[in-house]
Amino acid sequence: MSITAKSVYRDTGNFFRNQFITILLIALLCAFITVVLGHAFSPSDEQLSILSEGDNLAGSAGLFELVQNMTPEQQQVLLRASAASTFSGLVGNAILVGGVLLLIQLVSAGHRVSALRAIGASAPVLPKLLLLILFTTFLVQMGMMLVLVPGVLLAIVLAFAPIMLVQDNMGILGAMRSSMRLAWANLRLVAPAIIGWLVAKTLLLLFASSFAALTPNVGAVVINTISNLISALLLIYLFRVYMLIRS
């Protein structure tokens, strides 16, 4: 059966519209979890103020030189802030991916599903999802740091990995290997969606300053919720493509 991107876009839009309230609640809950965890594990404002102290950072040409010029205390604060941001983001993303994929599964099986039920149903796969997202995020970001194209390519070929892990109960490495083969064979369907998702995420970061009127925590929840909705839309599209390929 020939699969057209247009028909998949239409199916994705219909599902997203019909389940919008549930998806919005999942996105909002995951955003709240991300912000709360980030706030709980981040250094205090007093500790963060250390990063702006002293003249040792002036004239640093790049990130690596900036870190090298920091005092050990400043490096420790920066490391803790980065670790808190990374950990909270990974947990939020894992819950989002698990919740959305289980929502799709349950709705497709004819069940009425709430946001909490979808997230609760995803609990058994969350540890594996967390590790999978950690590995894939690391690979994609390393590719982005070296040269942009390898990072984008890795994001494309690993796109089906979370779906295979949840839908087919695969292991982490098995899902990554299978995703690479399947996504590469269906590049015309996967690549535009992933590139569109990356562009949308980038634009959201560029317009993040528009939320400056809100308090920092509220602004962070709003931005994360919008980002989660974009990711949920991509997951629905990829799940639909995957099921059509399998059939």
Curated annotation (Swiss-Prot):
- Look up and give the membrane topology term: Multi-pass membrane protein
Per the record, the similarity remark reads: Belongs to the UPF0259 family.
Major localization listed first in the record, in broad terms:
membrane
Recite the UniProt keywords alphabetically.
Answer: Cell inner membrane, Cell membrane, Membrane, Transmembrane, Transmembrane helix
Q: Where are the transmembrane segments?
A: 20-40, 87-107, 119-139, 146-166, 189-209, 219-239
Q: Which InterPro entries has this protein been placed in?
A: UPF0259
Q: Pfam families recorded for this chain? A: UPF0259 (PF06790)
The name of this protein is UPF0259 membrane protein KPN78578_12180
Localization of this protein: Cell inner membrane
- What GO CC terms are in its UniProt record? plasma membrane
